[in-house]
């Protein structure tokens, strides 16, 4: 089945251009046409005072949005004379002052507009709405402006997380936005002294930036949010399907390096960063564009330069930083692999077994920003008999989720369809993820479950040196799964520690080739033909690789006893064992009757 084997060149992506882009002026916002168009429309239509943006909400991201708005909309505009000026008159020191208000006449007035656009890294009632201070041992009053006063007539940028943590701030802010009036809230002492502060007109626009989860939570507290606000998304990933898009993203990368770190990138570094970020997006045509994330990578790579005067980042420097990041985070991964290598968790990578196969899982721990793949032994036992069922042991013991259960049912339906079995199965089977003590979910093991079920029914051994991942439908077609890079590398790591023998490998869905961005050790092993990757489009191809037999009869092929198709072999086994069971049943009935006589 060499036609189904992947060549080493296909295991990691590279850009199609061979020279660095000449134009390195692309910015983050050049990669966000939907977002910038939405902001244009929001400002032009003036229908809603609020714009909700799905995006990263770190302060650096809010600041980046602030800078974009300033440069794009207010670059040539001085701050308008907008707002008010509060005047205090206090003829008698024993009385509270009389406070009068007039329109601001200059930007120096105490409640005049200070900014066109402003974001906040910290929110409190005082920082947002200002405060009224009564000086100690005195009846003097001081008014401190808040953010909303400083940006009166402009745009305020806040994160959804900030508002969720103090939702009462949002309720007051929404009231101000709707009424376009700001009323001072006085403490009890000042209220008793009948200190009156005139309310002021306040018109501003608000941008709320938040993650999808935070915005969903926000909407639960404010169900009519999207009746009050426009909505747009800051794309976390950029399309790079064609060469022009690739060069645009590479130009953006070079621009970040030059402006943020005063360094340069060579083509090898751009390709290595592309490979790194493809692992996150799991799509060679989608790549992360987060400035914060990319700058972190560039800073880390720059720390591995040979001398302090070297300001060109290459692939080797990026790779060193990547390996250092993995080393910092992979302690739990190494502990897991040690358990397998010490046979505390039994995973066989050599020989053959009937009804046993190595599936592949992605392991994630809460609070750990790192996931990894590891093999999982899936076993199957069958018993021939009418009215049988396939028992998912993990699901029955509430150790598997609904999607896993769905995958198991699809595997059963697929097998019944291939074998043309009656609705009442002529056999019983039990499938289990061996030595699995935590909850599992997902349908990426459904191809492996079908294969192990076929092995048990046909009584043919499966090679333990080949692991399998893939989801199937009822017709046996193999579909995409996630985490394919981690899964391949996890099985490879175990095989490598035990010694590569040139026969080990992984079967993956053909449709996930676009996800592949494997580490250099796997690529080198595939290049040396010490490790293999097979791509399959349907279950029949996977079973041909594993069992060296066709799943069903092929019209142009001659069959003998040693190469009979699997469906014939399974039906023959079921028939023979059913006859044997029937004969045994008759014998036991005769024996029972003799004893009674």
Report residues per predicted region.
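Short regulatory helix/loop adjacent to the ATP-binding pocket of P-loop NTPases
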Residues: 214-228, 519-525
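Conserved P-loop NTPase motor cores
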Residues: 212, 229, 234-238, 436, ...
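The structured alpha-helical core of multi-pass membrane proteins
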Residues: 380-382
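Conserved ASCE/P-loop NTPase catalytic core
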Residues: 1-219, 232-242, 251-267, 271-376, ...
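Peripheral, non-AAA+ core regions of ATP-driven protein-machinery
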Residues: 1-20, 37-42, 145, 160-167, ...
């Amino acid at each position: 089945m060499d036609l189904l084997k992947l060549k080493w060149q296909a295991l990691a992506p590279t850009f199609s251009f061979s020279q660095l882009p000449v134009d390195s002026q692309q910015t983050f916002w050049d990669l966000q046409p939907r977002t910038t168009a939405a902001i244009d429309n929001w400002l032009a239509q003036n229908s809603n005072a609020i714009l909700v943006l799905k995006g990263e909400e770190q302060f650096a991201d809010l600041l980046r949005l602030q800078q974009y708005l300033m440069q794009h909309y207010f670059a040539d505009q001085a701050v308008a004379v907008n707002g008010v000026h509060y005047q205090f008159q206090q003829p008698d020191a024993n009385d509270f002052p009389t406070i009068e208000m007039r329109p601001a006449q200059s930007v120096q007035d105490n409640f005049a507009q200070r900014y066109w656009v402003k974001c906040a890294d910290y929110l409190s009632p005082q920082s947002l709405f200002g405060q009224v201070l009564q000086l100690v041992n005195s009846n003097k009053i001081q008014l401190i402006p808040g953010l909303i006063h400083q940006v009166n007539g402009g745009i305020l940028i806040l994160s959804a997380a900030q508002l969720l943590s103090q939702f009462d701030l949002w309720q007051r802010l929404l009231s101000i936005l709707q009424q376009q009036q700001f009323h001072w809230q006085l403490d009890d002492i000042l209220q008793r002294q009948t200190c009156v502060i005139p309310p002021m007109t306040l018109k501003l626009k608000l941008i709320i930036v938040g993650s999808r989860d935070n915005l969903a939570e926000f909407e639960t507290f404010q169900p009519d949010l999207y009746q009050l606000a426009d909505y747009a998304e800051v794309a976390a990933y950029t399309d790079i399907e064609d060469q022009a898009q690739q060069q645009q993203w590479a130009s953006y990368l070079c621009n970040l390096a030059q402006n943020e770190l005063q360094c340069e990138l060579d083509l090898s570094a751009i390709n290595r960063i592309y490979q790194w970020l493809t692992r996150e997006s799991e799509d060679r045509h989608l790549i992360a564009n987060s400035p914060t994330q990319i700058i972190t990578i560039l800073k880390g790579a720059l720390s591995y330069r040979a001398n302090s005067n070297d300001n060109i980042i290459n692939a080797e420097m990026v790779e060193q930083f990547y390996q250092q990041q993995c080393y910092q985070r992979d302690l739990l991964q190494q502990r897991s692999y040690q358990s397998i290598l010490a046979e505390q968790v039994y995973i066989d990578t050599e020989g053959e077994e009937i009804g046993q196969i190595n599936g592949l899982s992605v392991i994630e721990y809460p609070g750990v920003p790192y996931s990894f793949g590891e093999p999982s032994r899936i076993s199957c036992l069958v018993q021939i008999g009418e009215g049988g069922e396939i028992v998912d042991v993990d699901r029955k013991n509430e150790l598997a989720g609904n999607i896993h259960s769905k995958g198991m049912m699809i595997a059963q339906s697929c097998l019944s369809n291939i074998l043309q079995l009656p609705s009442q199965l002529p056999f019983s089977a039990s499938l289990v993820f061996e030595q699995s003590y935590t909850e599992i979910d997902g349908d990426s093991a459904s191809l492996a479950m079908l294969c192990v079920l076929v092995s048990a029914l046909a009584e043919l051994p499966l090679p333990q040196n080949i692991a399998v991942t893939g989801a199937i439908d009822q017709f046996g077609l193999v579909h995409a799964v996630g985490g394919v890079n981690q899964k391949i590398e996890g099985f490879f790591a175990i095989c490598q520690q035990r010694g590569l023998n040139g026969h080990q490998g992984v079967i993956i869905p053909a449709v996930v080739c676009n996800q592949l961005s494997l580490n250099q050790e796997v690529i080198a092993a595939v290049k040396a033909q010490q490790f293999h990757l097979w791509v399959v489009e349907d279950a029949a191809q996977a079973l041909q690789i594993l069992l060296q037999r066709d799943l069903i009869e092929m019209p142009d092929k001659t069959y003998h006893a040693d190469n009979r198709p699997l469906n014939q072999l399974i039906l023959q086994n079921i028939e023979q064992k059913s006859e044997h069971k029937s004969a045994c049943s008759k014998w036991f009935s005769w024996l029972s009757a003799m004893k009674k006589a």
